């Protein structure tokens, strides 16, 4: 748990977990369809200009950009899966184009961190990630 202290050091705010990730999109309907139907992310609800999904207890908010700004492709969503090879094959079968195949990006005692990168229809980078025991 992280503690963020005020300048005076007398009050603190305890940040216990990530609650929501926001991604600005240009075509909300198309992106809602992609995340819900192609990736299979559970859809929670929609509000004017926004769609919300559940990523294992962390909410994903797709939203139209604020007035005067545009959608940016800066953040990467890392989607944790138990079997990266199976998840990759399933998404390829649904027509999701990947930038490459799943591969190890880091080795640590007893395992490896594997990733596979792809983009949504608006060019936002996403990745599958999985800790693989060796």
Each model region followed by its residue ranges:
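Vicinal oxygen chelate
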Residues: 28, 77-125
């Amino acid at each position: 748990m992280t503690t963020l202290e005020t300048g005076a050091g007398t009050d603190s705010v305890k940040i216990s977990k990530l609650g929501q990730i926001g991604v600005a999109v240009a075509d909300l309907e198309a992106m809602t369809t992609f995340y819900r139907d192609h990736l299979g992310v559970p859809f929670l609800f929609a509000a004017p200009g926004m769609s919300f999904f559940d990523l294992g207890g962390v909410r994903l908010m797709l939203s139209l950009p604020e007035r005067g700004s545009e959608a940016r492709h800066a953040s990467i969503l890392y989607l944790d899966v138990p079997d990266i090879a199976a998840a990759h094959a399933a998404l390829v079968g649904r027509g999701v184009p990947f930038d490459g195949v799943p591969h190890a990006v880091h080795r640590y005692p007893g395992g490896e961190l594997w990733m596979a990168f792809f983009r949504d229809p608006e060019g936002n980078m996403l990745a599958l990630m999985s800790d693989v025991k060796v």
